[in-house]
Structure formats: C-alpha cells, structure tokens
Amino acid sequence: MKESYSFSRLKMFGSCKYAYWQNYIEDKDKRPEKEGHGTSDFGNFCHDILERYGKGELAEWEMLDYYEAHFSENIKNDFVLQMTENFSRDMRSKYYDDGYEFFKEFEGFPDFSIISTEKRFDVDCGDFRLNGKIDLTARDEAGKLIIVDYKSKSKFKSKAEREDYAKQLYVYAYAAKELYGEYPSRLAFFMFRTNQWVWFDFDETRMQETLDWCASVVKEIEEEKEKFGDKPFEPIEETIYGDFNFYEANFCPFRSSCKYHH
C-alpha cells in the first residue's frame, strides 16, 4: 500500500526532521505526549464555526453568539509566545478580540456558491498518495471553480512565505481534478483574523512544480529512513541570523520534551 502524505506532514519534515520522526515513525507507545498551543486551538475553533456556516448549520448572525458561548471550552492551551530567550507575550486577548470582530462583521460569501466545506481527499500521486481537507470549494459568479483555505495567520511575513504556503493550495487543486473533474480557476487563502483575501490564478505549471516538490520530500524521507534505520532523525534547528528561533519553536508539538529545545 502506498504511503499517504498531507501538506502539513511534508512541511513538518522540512521544518524539523526529528519532530517528524517522533510524530510519524517512532513507536506510538514510546512517543511523548503532543502539546497544543492556543493559536492552533483558536484556528481549529474558527474553522469549525466556518464549517458550520458552510454546511448551513449556523447563519451569519448566529456565528458571533456561538463564538462567545463556546470559546473557552474549545481553547485548551495558553497563547503565550516565546519571542526570545527572555521575552514572551500572551496573545489570548489579541486573538479573542480579532475573532470577535471577524464574526461580528462577517456577512458570508455573497460572491460564491458553496459546493462543499471541509472536503476530505486521498488521491494517487505516482509512488505515493496525497491527502488533506479542503476548507471551502465553491463556484464564483461566472461559474468557475475556486478553492479556499482558511488561515488564522494575520498575514504572510514575506512573498517567499506566501509562495511556500501556496503549495498547499496546489495540492488541493490537484485533488480537485479527481473530486470535481476540473481544476479550479482560482485559489485563495482567507486570512480571517484580518478579513483579508490572498488570491492566486491557477497555474498548471506551478501545480506540477508543487507535485515535484512533494515527490522530492517523499524521496528524502525514504532516504532518511534508510540512513538512520530505527534511530531518530537528526533535528533541523530553526535559526534567525544564527540564533535559535524561539518563535517557531512555540508550535512544535514536542517542544517541552525535546532534548534539542533551548
């Protein structure tokens, strides 16, 4: 049976091979307990509300009340972000306020006709498979297929980061051909905390480049397995100008138990 990979799984390997080994290869009974983070809880909670809206379970005017009523029970972890070795910030109030304002002002997607929300896929891609969940599939006013991924990020830090994340949309575009019989005409990230849209016109060449990237990462994973056998992969340390990147380490699911964490 072919191994199936999600975009997040491939991205984790590129971020830290040791974390990847712990999450996907180490014996389950030996893995340390995974840690969450308030920002991830927030993103999942808002995704859930938008999913309920997309399925017709919540109307626009009900979303804010639902957000207020269920926020605490859905946020299991704190929002503290370690910025440097000696400085951290608690972002709970900021995230809560951003979510409140978003759902307060949300007026739906009047320019779209929703086809599906949180559509799962697991499709063949050569020597491996790709899986995932498309947040929103819809048709625009011209009847063209569009794919939307919700992001709780406020913005992309750079054009390079935006283009790197666009690979996720192109994985979804590839799956759309099997799911709907056509490629989308446009792809978008909806940065809901700031109510901003980041659009991409579909480019088949860019999609093929993304599939080639997926294949190269899968190949590297297999090479690491052969190299290390049953031993852990070596970590990749995120750095900024040679210093440990405390910010990125906030989101590692094994940060407290990791022997490499500073």
Where on the chain are the PLM-derived regions?
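Non-catalytic protein-protein interaction segments used by genome-maintenance enzymes to assemble
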Residues: 116-174, 192
